[in-house]
Amino acid sequence: MNHLAEIESLLYVAGDEGITLQHIARLIMLDEAAVRQLLTKLAKRYQEDEQSGLNLIQAADCYKLVTKKAYAGLLKAYFDGPVSTSISQAALEVLAIIVYRQPLTRIEIDEVRGVQSSGAIQTLLARQLIVEKGRKDAPGRPILYGTSDYFLDYFGLGSLKELPELEQMTLTDDTAESDNDSADLYYRQFEQTLNETGPETAPKGEQ
C-alpha cells in the first residue's frame, strides 16, 4: 500500500486538530524516522504543486493540512456568503450536537454521529458559530469545541438556556441503539430552535 497516500488520508480526517508523527507511525506500522521522511516529502510535494491549494504544516507536535495563503481571498468570499447557502445539513447536525453536549472533542462528535466530522467542524469554525474551548485532559490533548457568542446573536438567542431542553425528547429503545439516530435526535431538537427563533431563511442541508 502507498504510505504517502495513507498519511495523506490520515491528515485529511484529522482536520484542524492535526495528527502526531507518533500516531501516524503506529497506524501505518512504520518507524518514526521513516514517517518523518515521508511527511517531509509530502510537504515538499504540496509546496511545489501549483495545481494544489493545500500545504502540509507542523504546528507544535502535530501535522495538518491547510489551505495556501494565495487562496485566502477566495475562501473569505465563500465564508462571507449567506449561511443559508453554504452550511450543509451535516454541519447543522454537528452544531446541534455541540449545542447540547458542549464542550466536547471532534472524536466525541464522531462517536455520536457515527461518521467523521472534521469538514463540518471547519465550516462551523469559519462561520464563527463555534469556537475552541480549550483542550481536554486526555492523551493527545484534543481540542474542545463549544458555541460562540455569535451563535447566540445569529439565532436570536439571549442565552443557551433559551434552547429547548434535551430531556423533552422521547428516547425509545430503538432510537437509543443507533449512533445516527442519536445524532438525529439532537438535530431535530435544534431544528425546533431554527424554526422558532432562527433567521427567516434557515440553513438548508446540502447532503
UniProtKB/Swiss-Prot annotation:
<comment type="similarity">
    <text>Belongs to the ScpB family.</text>
</comment>
<protein>
    <recommendedName>
        <fullName>Segregation and condensation protein B</fullName>
    </recommendedName>
</protein>
<keyword id="KW-0159">Chromosome partition</keyword>
<dbReference type="GO" id="GO:0005737">
    <property type="term" value="C:cytoplasm"/>
</dbReference>
<dbReference type="InterPro" id="IPR036388">
    <property type="entry name" value="WH-like_DNA-bd_sf"/>
</dbReference>
<dbReference type="InterPro" id="IPR005234">
    <property type="entry name" value="ScpB_csome_segregation"/>
</dbReference>
<dbReference type="InterPro" id="IPR036390">
    <property type="entry name" value="WH_DNA-bd_sf"/>
</dbReference>
<feature type="region of interest" description="Disordered">
    <location>
        <begin position="173"/>
        <end position="207"/>
    </location>
</feature>
<dbReference type="GO" id="GO:0051301">
    <property type="term" value="P:cell division"/>
</dbReference>
<comment type="subunit">
    <text>Homodimer. Homodimerization may be required to stabilize the binding of ScpA to the Smc head domains. Component of a cohesin-like complex composed of ScpA, ScpB and the Smc homodimer, in which ScpA and ScpB bind to the head domain of Smc. The presence of the three proteins is required for the association of the complex with DNA.</text>
</comment>
<dbReference type="GO" id="GO:0051304">
    <property type="term" value="P:chromosome separation"/>
</dbReference>
<comment type="function">
    <text>Participates in chromosomal partition during cell division. May act via the formation of a condensin-like complex containing Smc and ScpA that pull DNA away from mid-cell into both cell halves.</text>
</comment>
<keyword id="KW-0963">Cytoplasm</keyword>
<dbReference type="GO" id="GO:0006260">
    <property type="term" value="P:DNA replication"/>
</dbReference>
<keyword id="KW-0131">Cell cycle</keyword>
<keyword id="KW-0132">Cell division</keyword>
<dbReference type="Pfam" id="PF04079">
    <property type="entry name" value="SMC_ScpB"/>
</dbReference>
